[in-house]
C-alpha cells in the first residue's frame, strides 16, 4: 500500500523511508550485510570519512512503469562507476552483484514510497561508501561501510523544464589527472562556493572550463553538457576530468539508434558555444535541463532555441529517454531492470 504522501506536491528533498541497506568491510572482506531501520550513522570522531573525505556515492531512481512494475535504469553502470571511484580513493570495491542486490532489497523494502505511475515523481536511491575507522595520519582507512538509502522525490522541474541561464565561471572544478572523473564527495564540496556565488548573481549553474588551458568546455558542478548543432548533430564534451554521466551515455545511444542523429563525442572549444542551436545539462535528477543563455567573459550568448521552452531536438531526446525508462518505448536489452 502506498504511503500517505501528497505525490502531486512532493518536492525534491529528503523524506526518511523505513529501511536502508548496510554492509561493513573489515579485516579485508565484506560481511553479509542486510536491511536496517535506523537512519542514523554513528561513527568515531576520527573516522576517515570525517578527517580526509574518503567517501564516494552514486545516484539512481526507481519508479513504476505503465504496466505496474517497479524498475531501475541501468544500475549496473552505477555499480561500475562506484568501483572506479573506490579504486581512485583507495577504497575496497564492491562486487556488482552485491551492489545490485542491495539496491533491489532496499527498493523492495520501501516499495510503498515509490510514487504512483504518471506523477513524474520517483524513489531516489543513494548508494554510498565511506571510511569508518579512526585515521589520524593521512592514509586510507582500514574499515568501510557501504550503505543505500532511498527517498521519494517529486519531479525536478515543477510545471515543465524551462531553459536556464548559466555563466562561464572563473573557478575550476577539477585538476588535470585529478578526481574529476569519479563521483567523490570532495568534488561536490569544492563546487559549493562557486554555485552559491552563481545563484547570488542570478545564474542557475556554472559552466566549468578545463583547468589546464581554460579553453574547453567541461561540465557543471553536477551535470554533463549536451549540444545540438544547427544541422542536427548531438555533440558532447570529451575530457578525462569529466564525470562519465550515465544519462549522457544513454542520450548519445538514443540520439544515434532511435532518432538517427549523428553523434560526436569530442573536445569542445568555448568559441563554438555561439554556434550551437540548442544546449542542455543532463543527469539523473532532471534528465535534461535546457540552457537558454550563457554569460561569458566576451559577452552574452543567447541560444537560438530561446528561453521559453526546450529546443525541439532536445525535447525529442528527453521524451524518448523518458519513454524508454517508463516502459512506453521498447528499451535496449538490459537497460531497464525489474525490481518487483
Feature annotation, model-predicted:
Residues 2-11, 15-17, 158, 212, ...:
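Conserved catalytic-core subdomain
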Residues 1-37:
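Short, Gly/Pro- and small/polar-rich lid/capping loops
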Residues 14-25, 48, 161-209, 313-340:
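Active-site-adjacent loop/helix segments that line or gate small-molecule/cofactor pockets in enzymes
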Residues 24-30, 56, 63-68, 75, ...:
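Short acidic-glycine loop/turn motifs at beta-strand connectors
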Residues 44-61, 285-289:
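Conserved phosphate/anionic-ligand binding catalytic regions in large, soluble enzymes, centered on
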Residues 96-97, 113-122, 206-209, 261-269, ...:
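Flexible, glycine/charged-enriched surface loops at secondary-structure junctions
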Residues 6, 75-78, 83, 89-201, ...:
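Extended Lys/Arg-rich, glycine-bearing segments that form polyanion-binding/interaction patches
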